[in-house]
From Swiss-Prot:
Main function: Part of the MsrPQ system that repairs oxidized periplasmic proteins containing methionine sulfoxide residues (Met-O), using respiratory chain electrons. Thus protects these proteins from oxidative-stress damage caused by reactive species of oxygen and chlorine generated by the host defense mechanisms. MsrPQ is essential for the maintenance of envelope integrity under bleach stress, rescuing a wide series of structurally unrelated periplasmic proteins from methionine oxidation.
Name recorded for this polypeptide: Protein-methionine-sulfoxide reductase catalytic subunit MsrP
A GO term, aspect molecular function: metal ion binding
Keyword vocabulary terms for this entry: Metal-binding, Molybdenum, Oxidoreductase, Periplasm, Signal
Gene symbol of the encoding locus: msrP
Originating species: Actinobacillus succinogenes (strain ATCC 55618 / DSM 22257 / CCUG 43843 / 130Z)
Binding site for Mo-molybdopterin: 72, 75-76, 129, 164, 216, 221, 232-234
Transmembrane segments: none
One record GO biological process: protein repair
C-alpha cells in the first residue's frame, strides 16, 4: 500500500516551526491558494489562535495548510474547488448560535463563546472525499457527545439531524441555484445517535492551531472521519434529535449515488467512479500526484465497525 512520506507532504513539526519563526507565514500560504491576496488577508485576519490539547500521531503527516484551506467543497460559495476560498469571506460568523432541539429533555441554544468554552483538543484525522481524494487535517474541537449530553437525549432519540446556516445574501450558492450546484438549501445532514455519540465524532472550531476559515466551515462544523466528507456538515446552526431518519441533502438529491450512511468503503463504488483508491492532495507534482488504496472506514474500522453489526453495507451505503 502506498503511504505518505515526508517528501509527499509537510510534517506537523515543520508547520509549527514556520509559524513560530516566520510571522505572517500563514497569510502568505493562504494567499497562494486564493485567487487574490486581498481575500486571503481578509480571511486570515479573522482567525485567532486557540488553546487546545495537542494530538501526537507521528504516523499521520499533515497535508500542507494551503491545500486544506484552498481546495474545498462548499457549494454555498460555488462548485469549483477554489470558489469557497474566493467567496466565503462574506460569511458572517458573529454573532453565532446553535439551537439543540427535538427529542431532548433540555433544549438549548449555545452561543459561540459557550461552544469555544468546551475543552478543546486537536484531532489529526484522515479526510476522504466521495470524489476519491484525501487529506490529513489537524482539526481542533470537542466530542459531539459532550454537547448532546448537556441536552439529554430522550429514549425516543435515534438520530441526530444537522442544518447549515441559510443566508442567501452572503452565501451566493443559496441565492443562485446554478452557482450552488442545484442543491436544496439549507444544507442538511444526519447521523444515527450511536454514530453521533462515538468518541471519534467531533464538532470542530479550528484547524492548524487557529479558528476555522470560512471556506472550511467556520465557525463550527461536524467532522466524522470514517465517512465521506459530505457528511461533515459546515457552519452548523441547528441540531435536532429525532426518532426517524432525517432527510439529508445529497441523499435526497441522488439517493442511488449518495447513501445516508456514506461510510468510506473501497468495495462500494460510486456509480460513476471507483472508490478503491484515492488521490492524495498535496503529494507529488503537477503530473505526479500519488494515489493510495482506500481503507475500509477510512482506517477507523477498529473504532466504528461495531456500529454496523448485522447491517449490509453494500445495500446500506
Amino acid at each position: 500500500m502506498n503511504k505518505f512520506t515526508k517528501t509527499d507532504v509537510t510534517p506537523e513539526k515543520l508547520f509549527i516551526q514556520r509559524r513560530k519563526i516566520i510571522q505572517g507565514m500563514s497569510v502568505l500560504s493562504a494567499a497562494a491558494a486564493f485567487p487574490n491576496l486581498a481575500a486571503a488577508k481578509k480571511t486570515e485576519e479573522k482567525r485567532t489562535a486557540l488553546s487546545f490539547k495537542a494530538d501526537n500521531k507521528p504516523d499521520l503527516i499533515l497535508t500542507p495548510e494551503n491545500k486544506v484551506i484552498g481546495y474545498n467543497n462548499y457549494y454555498e460559495f460555488g462548485v469549483d474547488k477554489a470558489s469557497p476560498a474566493k467567496f466565503a469571506s462574506t460569511l458572517k460568523t458573529e454573532p453565532w448560535t446553535i439551537e439543540v432541539s427535538g427529542e431532548v429533555e433540555n433544549p438549548m441554544i449555545f452561543t459561540l463563546a459557550q461552544l469555544l468554552a468546551f475543552p478543546l483538543e486537536e484531532r489529526i484525522y484522515r479526510l476522504r472525499c466521495v470524489e476519491a481524494w484525501s487529506m490529513i487535517v489537524p482539526w481542533i474541537g470537542f466530542e459531539l457527545s459532550r454537547l448532546l449530553e448537556k441536552a439529554k437525549p430522550t429514549g425516543k432519540a435515534k438520530y441526530v439531524a444537522f442544518e447549515t446556516l441559510y443566508d442567501p445574501a452572503n452565501m451566493p450558492g443559496q441565492k443562485n441555484t446554478l452557482f450552488g450546484g442545484g442543491l436544496d438549501y439549507p444544507y442538511k445532514e444526519g447521523l444515527t445517535l450511536a454514530e453521533a455519540m462515538n468518541p471519534l465524532t467531533i464538532l470542530s472550531v479550528g484547524l492548524y492551531g487557529k479558528t476555522l476559515t470560512p471556506q472550511n466551515g467556520a465557525p463550527i462544523r461536524l467532522v466524522v472521519p470514517w465517512k465521506y466528507g459530505f457528511k461533515s456538515i459546515k457552519s452548523i446552526v441547528k441540531i435536532r434529535l429525532t426518532e426517524r431518519q432525517p432527510v439529508t441533502t445529497w441523499n435526497q438529491l441522488t439517493p442511488h449515488e449518495y447513501g445516508f450512511y456514506a461510510n468510506v468503503n473501497p468495495e462500494v463504488d460510486h456509480p460513476r467512479w471507483s472508490q478503491a483508491s484515492e488521490r492524495i492532495i498535496g503529494s507529488g507534482g503537477l503530473f505526479t500526484v500519488k494515489r493510495q488504496p482506500t481503507l475500509p472506514f477510512n482506517g477507523y474500522e477498529k473504532e466504528v465497525a461495531h456500529l454496523y453489526k448485522g447491517l449490509d453495507l453494500k445495500v446500506n451505503f
